[in-house]
Amino acid sequence: MEWKTCSFCEGTIEPGCGKKYVKKDGSVMHFCSSKCEKNFKLGRVGRKVKWTNTFKRINRGQ
């Protein structure tokens, strides 16, 4: 079993946890929580949401 990375916040997902969402074009999204899934479905981008690891990584030096 391998650990996955959340497609929204870049958090780690343990084997057997989280959700897998398959879009109409066949691409697969992995979510660590319903919070990440709902934010993605609302059209938000992880880079612009302050609590995500993606935002923290990009804006580390600023």
From Swiss-Prot:
GO MF, one annotated term: rRNA binding
Start and end residues, zinc fingers (C4-type): 6-36
GO cellular component, one term: ribonucleoprotein complex
Cofactor binding: number and manner: Binds 1 zinc ion per subunit.
Cofactor(s) listed: Zn(2+)
One Pfam family of this chain: Ribosomal_L24e
PROSITE patterns for the chain: RIBOSOMAL_L24E
SUPFAM superfamilies recorded: Glucocorticoid receptor-like (DNA-binding domain)
GO BP annotations, alphabetical order: translation
InterPro entries: L24e/L24_sf, Ribosomal_eL24, Ribosomal_eL24-rel_arc, Ribosomal_eL24-rel_N, Ribosomal_eL24_CS, TRASH_dom
Residues reported to bind Zn(2+): C6, C9, C32, C36
Keyword set, alphabetical order: Metal-binding, Ribonucleoprotein, Ribosomal protein, RNA-binding, rRNA-binding, Zinc, Zinc-finger
Family note: Belongs to the eukaryotic ribosomal protein eL24 family.
NCBIfam families xref list: PRK14891.1-1
Main function: Binds to the 23S rRNA.
Assembly behavior: Part of the 50S ribosomal subunit. Forms a cluster with proteins L3 and L14.
Name of the protein in question: Large ribosomal subunit protein eL24
